[in-house]
Each structure stands twice: as C-alpha cells, then as structure tokens.
Amino acid sequence: MQAYCKICDQSLRSHLADLQRHARSKKHRENSAVLNRTKYKSLMSHGYQATITAEKKIVDIKLALYITMHSSIRSVDHLGELLSTLGKGSNLENLRLHRTKCSNVIKHVIAPVLFKDLVKAIGKKGYSIIIDESTDVSVTKYLCMCIKYFDTTENRMLTDFLGILEVERATAIDLHKSIVEYLQRIGIPLKNMVAIGTDGASNLCGRNHSVYTLLKCDVPNLQLMRCTCHSLHLCSSKASEELPGSLDFLVREVFNWFSISPLRKINYKKTFDLINSGNDAQKFRQMIQLSRTRWLAFYNVVKRLLEQWVELKTHFRIACDAEKCYTARTIRDMLENDCNRLYLISLVFLSFAGQILKPTFLRAAHNKSLVQQVIDAVGNDLAFLPVAEVDFGQEFRKEFQGSQISAERKSQIQQRCFNFLKRFLTEMAQRLPTNFEIFKKIELLSPSRCTLQVRIKFEELPLQDFFDSDCDVSLYKSQWEKLSFVDWNAHYKGDVPTNILVFWPDVYKYTDACGRFIFRELAEVVLKMLTIPTSNAVVERAFSALTLIKTRIRNKLSTSMLQSLLTIRMHFQAHEKCCKMFQPSTEMIDRFKSSFMYESKTGTSGPSCANSDSEENENESLHEMIDIISDML
C-alpha cells in the first residue's frame, strides 16, 4: 500500500519515516511554497455548532475508561470501528473514538476529575505519604507517591495514588524538593503531614540526612514508618544464613531445570502421571520460581517442592542416566538426603508470619506486651527453651521421629532451626521503629478498651504528637470522658466491632439527639494517628502497574499520560470498583469539549501533566495523517 503526495505528484511508501523525509525534502518545500494558501472560513464562523449529546459523551468516556483499565490506547482504533459496525440502531452507530481522542479523554476528562476529587477528599485533614523511587524500562527514574487519609464520604481509611514525578537524581535534597513543590502545586498543606512510609533506603529514611530528616524540619512531629514487609524480608534473609546454603540452590535449580526445556517438563509430567495414577491421584502442577527480592514468599515454593518430593526424586534418578548432567546428579543427591527434607519442612512451618512472630519457644513471662516480651528475651539465653523442647510443627516432628538419620545429625538440624528463630528475633528487635511507643499504646484506643467505664487516663493516650498547635486540649479530654457514657451496644444494635478502623469512623459520625457531632474533634485526632502506614506495598503495586503499562513496545509514553493512566487505575483499585460500575460525573461530561480536550497545553490531572510531551502529539497527528492517506487509496 502506497501514499500519494498531491503537491509533488509522487507516490510514497505509507511509512512514517518516509513521509517525514519527504516533507523535509527540497522538492516538497518548493512546491508547497507556490501553493495558494487562502484560508477559508470555518463552519463555526457561520454559526454552525457541532453538538454531542450527553449520551454520546458517556459512551466515549466509558469506553476510554475501559481502555485505560484493560488495554493499550492504540487498540481503541479497531475496537471503536468494530463497535460502530455492530451497534447499528444504537448510540454506538455514530461512535467516533480513536487513539487521539481517547488519549485526550483520559488525560483531560477522566483523570483530572478523579484527581480533583482526591485532593478535595483530603482537604485540610491529616494524611501520611508513602514514597519510593524506581527506574522503568526506558531508564527513566520516577518518584512515586501514595497517600493514606480518612475519607469522610466513604467513612473509611483509604490509601490512594497521589502522583509520579520524573527525577534526575535520587538524592535526599532532590527528592525532598520534588515532594514539597508537588504538594504545594496540588494544594495539599505540608503541615498536615502525619507520617512518611518508606522501604528503608538510606536516602529516604536515613538517620542523619534523608528525605525524612529534611521533611521533619518542616513538620516537627513527623513520624517515620519503615515498611514492615521489607523489614521482615531483611530479618528472614539474615536468619537464613543459619541454615545450609544448599537449600537455596536446591529450590532454585529445580525450577531452572524445567524452565529452560519443554522436553524435560514433558518427561517429568509422564513420570508424575505414572506415579499418581488412580482416582485419588494429585493433579500435576508446575514448580514455582523463588523470588530474589521477597524472601518471605518462599512458602508456596517449598510447599510445592515437598508435595512432589517422591516424583522429583524419581525423575532426577532417570535424568542422571539419560543426560549425564552434573546439575542433575547434584539435585538427585540433595533430594535423596533426608536432612534437606527436614530443613524444608521446618521452613514451611516457620514461614507463617504468625508462627514466626509468636514466641511459642520462649518461657512464660508476665509481660502483657507480646512484642516487648520478645525484645526483652532475645538478649537473654535463659529465656529460651532447650533446643530439644522447641516445637517446629507436627509434620516436622513426625518426619523427624521416622527418619533414619543419626542422632548427631538430628541434633544438628534442631540446633540450626533454633538458631534461625533466634537470629530472626534478634534482627527484628533491631529493626523496630523508633516511635514504637505509639504503636504499643494504640491498643488503648481499641473499642474493647475505650468503651469501658474504668479506662486509662487521657494524658496517657498516644495522641500528644498529633494535636494541632492551637487546639484546646480540654475539649479532647472532655470528649474522651464522655465516650464511655454512650451505650454502644444499643447504637450498633448488637456487639461493638472490635476493629479500630471500623469503630472510630463511626465515632466520627456519631451525633446526639440534637444532631450535634459530640466526638468529632477527638475522632479526628485518632483517625489522624491511624493514617500512619505500616508498609509501602501500595507503592510497589503502583510500580507493578507502571511496568504493565510502560513496556518495551510502549516505551515512549509521556509522563503526563503515565500519570493519568496510573491515577485512574489506582483510584479504582483503592475504592474497590470496576469499570463496569463506573458512571461519568457531571463534571466529566462538562469537560468533554474541545476547549478542555485539545486546546489545553497544560494537563489538569496533576502537576506532572504540565510536562506534556509535544512530540507525542506530533507523532499522533502523523499517525492520523497516514491513516487518512491509506483510507483514500
């Protein structure tokens, strides 16, 4: 298929590079210069107005949202034409939605309204930010920001996507400057920041010079919370040094053995089906890859390996003779070693977070705080049970007693598993947050404690760091004293909820017989404290969404488009909604016009949209020109 230039009377390949090259040629410029470029009046100047009904706008907005959530923008070219063909006699018959229009609907209609609603919902209330930095497939470094706040509309705590900023360097000064300027541009007061959540990187939360220390100069009562998931990962990684290093080799190489060869997987499946023939036979399932960055995620990997232990042992016995491979012999020898099986069984038991953190191996203590009990005990060897009395789980005990391993080797296995637990607790105690006292006292605000007639004094509550500088503390104290006078069982018409994140939002909305919010100020302070994040998993999800959106093929997405796509996707994820339930708001329908969609050079879905990439718009126009020329041939 060829394109044709009417000015030069010349046929061209309908490729973007050829059209651009011809447009820059001397011949085309000279022929274009002699043309009569008289501009004709537009239909608009004669009073003609193109009207699009609200129903058609809703169709375009919903379809653009579907594309944002589930597909690439380029696919709307074919999807729009297909729906127009199949929708004869309906609103879809006159559907005219292609990638240029769809992109502008996303950037200038949907995303700006959702972002505006987010900023409005945050308002002047306290909030916490969760930050992390990463590099995408195009080697562009981004700073991602999420925000945790109490949404009065939905009456619950939400963690939503706030923005993604392109940064040149990830130093503490540069990141701090980007965060402060961003919050100022979008209208969120910096002084209302309660806490900052990070993954533990030194440039983000270092003790001497970091983003946290710089922000603390602006907000003196700022709290720091390192991600518990990352901290547990580091604790587990350090503790795993007490176990044989061959376990990691075994788990990884078993997966690698089948991942590079379909023939090996087919042969193993035949062996598996032969061993598991019968009505009660287990179903064949593939091996799972062990993550290099999430040590705590080894549970499913080890469990799958133990489930197929006999089948794997049989397969590698055959593979040793068939392939004469050193790796196969090594894996076979490790599978035939019962010590390795015992270690893996103990790992399955220890991998449950509750079992890891629960000190069942400690002697009884009178300390009511479980975590404090662990902290006090890790430095005292007398606090631990003898190794022989430590419980590593029923399956481990059964396998341990039936094993033919020598008594010396059994004692060695028990000791190393015990050392794993002890090392884990030691590492965990070292990584506890500096503001640990606040988390210890959160229990005092639980529904079961604060609704009792005999309660702790107001001065002992962990709220002092969250009061405003000009607040009336006596007002909070009086509301705290009145809290136990309410019959909460009658209010809930049953049992009082035990979840603190359910109870205090209801306290925030509680009114007396006159309709007055009698606990509003106290509830605001408590909810402000509860915005402190416990992990930065939401930022990791945002980066995962970025990886799915910006791939090797779609590696030229501008930051403004990326911001809009992530704003929409993460909004629906945070609010637990789907595109099927979406109804465009009145403001979205009002913004669906050319003055917002095409003439705006600065984006409105967040400050990052001001970095709109003009090259992307030029490329889209050129693609549209190619499509028009191709349709004319």
Regions found by a protein language model. Give the residues of each.
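Alpha-helical structural modules in large enzymes and assemblies
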Residues: 1-633
